[in-house]
Amino acid sequence: MREVVSIHVGQAGVQIGNACWELYTIEHGLSPDGRLSDDSPSKHDDGFSTFFSETSSGKYVPRSLYVDLEPNVIDEVRNGPYRSLFHPETMITGKEDAASNYARGHYTIGKEQIDVVMDKVRRLVDNCNGLQGFFVFHSFGGGTGSGFGALILERLSTDYGKKSKLEFSVYPAPTLASSVVEPYNSVLTTHTTLEHSDCSFMVDNEAIYDICKKNLNIAQPGLTNLNRLIAQVVSSITASLRFDGSLNVDLNEFQTNLVPFPRIHFPLATLAPIVSVDKAGHESNSVAEMTYSCFEPGNQMVKCDPRDGKYMACALLYRGDVVPKDTNAAVALIKTKRTIQFVDWCPTGFKLGICNEPPAHVPGGDLAKVKRSMCMLSNTTAISSAWSRLDHKFDLLYSKRAFVHWYVGEGMEEGEFSEARQDLAALEKDYEEVGMDSADAEEEAAEY
């Protein structure tokens, strides 16, 4: 088996985790306490043992780890409807939180907890026959997500160097912010994890708020609405690991097809169709329509305009009632559209995946039940605008050295700030260079 261990760090990581495992149990016909129902699609297909391990009593337990430096969020899981799904030992909480401070999560408070966490990771790994890799869910802006998330990735890199490490990161939104020091935490965590993470799927809250408001007509989206939408994306990405399909995509294949250079590993996620229950009956939702709507900025999980950039690689993951003939026709149609530009050194650029299991529907959720859906993961140079926005906010704060004393007081050196900022400047430059046409790049090289 090719197992995957999911690690959910901090409030954002844990709450996205709740939405994901809720959806996985529905997809595989598991009850909230981890037992297979009689009409479950997974009765004859053991593919989902990549994400669940079976106990001797026939119960299925998620291969997951919940970690937070303060107890409140995980206590909700311990007392919630899925409390008997998770193994109690895979929920680790500290006594005091990281207070939105990267340095607390990474150095002071994080140091006390990291060995406990790595011990639990080792137990989960020992329980696997052929571990494929790790999924780490965290936010960039919080203290635990940024600091402790980075620390865990560093340790995973040391202990399990050859295994894939994929991140699912909540990126700071352009105008919404959950804390003043978000830019600091985000720049520091990106700098630390850049060399340790193989592929990082980003979502930002503002983009998802807008999707909930525009496509799903939710006047005031709450975190549950956002997380359930993110869970659909995660589920689409992992579906081919959990179900059989006519064109399966492996964890390593994501990297091979989406990451042209090690540092440029931040694909954009887009989901289609995102339709509310009252609109669903009026839409045909053909493969071509779905594919086309994935290239619309309105369906994207990060605020940036792909029309301003060029695509380097693109993975189209279909689920449900889809045949290869339709997907090939849809891709051929996309290639004729002039608005979608690929870099000239990567002419083909499309990777397809098809999973036969239709998308699941959360009872009482916002999304309508559909026969087919798709998720597009695209590595585009447009995402560099998100980095430059973040860097600008960092510069405004750092020019006055505002709030820096909180970080230095937790044992960080001020030099780390400038080092991290330089690394991100280099990342912006990397994106600029890969987006250049080969001819322009040669001219520029000649000038040096």
From Swiss-Prot:
GO biological process: microtubule-based process
Residues that hold Mg(2+) according to the record: E70
Highest taxon above the source species: Eukaryota
Enzyme Commission (EC) number: 3.6.5.-
Keyword GTP-binding: yes
Keywords, comma-separated and alphabetical: Cytoplasm, Cytoskeleton, GTP-binding, Hydrolase, Magnesium, Metal-binding, Microtubule, Nucleotide-binding
Pfam families: Tubulin, Tubulin_C
Family to which this protein belongs: Belongs to the tubulin family.
UniProt subunit comment: Dimer of alpha and beta chains. A typical microtubule is a hollow water-filled tube with an outer diameter of 25 nm and an inner diameter of 15 nM. Alpha-beta heterodimers associate head-to-tail to form protofilaments running lengthwise along the microtubule wall with the beta-tubulin subunit facing the microtubule plus end conferring a structural polarity. Microtubules usually have 13 protofilaments but different protofilament numbers can be found in some organisms and specialized cells.
Protein name per its UniProtKB record: Tubulin alpha-1A chain
Organism: Schizophyllum commune
Classification lineage: Eukaryota, Fungi, Dikarya, Basidiomycota, Agaricomycotina
Gene that specifies this protein: TUB-1A
